[in-house]
Amino acid sequence: MTRGNARELAIHLIFGREFTGETPSEVVRMRLEEGYYEQLAAEYEIYTERPTEKQVKYLENIVAGVVEHQEELNEIVGKFSIGWDVKRISRLNRVIMQLAAYEILYVDDVPEGVAVSEAVRLAKKYDDEMGKFVNGILGSFVRSLKENPAEEAPAVEEV
């Protein structure tokens, strides 16, 4: 499974968790159960390849990180979505931008440009019209970090 596919899977997990309220660990483990995962493979290509144990750890870390920082990430999305109330942004696009903002702030081995490009790719995959919107918000966020580097949050070590 590529990192891009793992990122898309993380989007599905975070999105689904918003409806169930499960802990990040629960949502990852439950969605990766044999029967459930195989059932999803019939609908989504990314589920045709099972993640390795290392990739499961990555998914757990990224889902937990986004959930832990969700309020901060929503504030970022809100700050840069000028003229939009965060609640009016579709839940899926909000989750896509939360994940990208989390990677930009807290994941050292993901360059900012990759996080933005992947978010745009995922937004377009699910809603072709949202690519520019997501790019605009995340691009403004990245530019603000370059203009005010003291505002950037410290990186969290990966486990």
Task: Locate each region found by the language model.
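N-terminal interaction/assembly modules
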Residues: 1-159
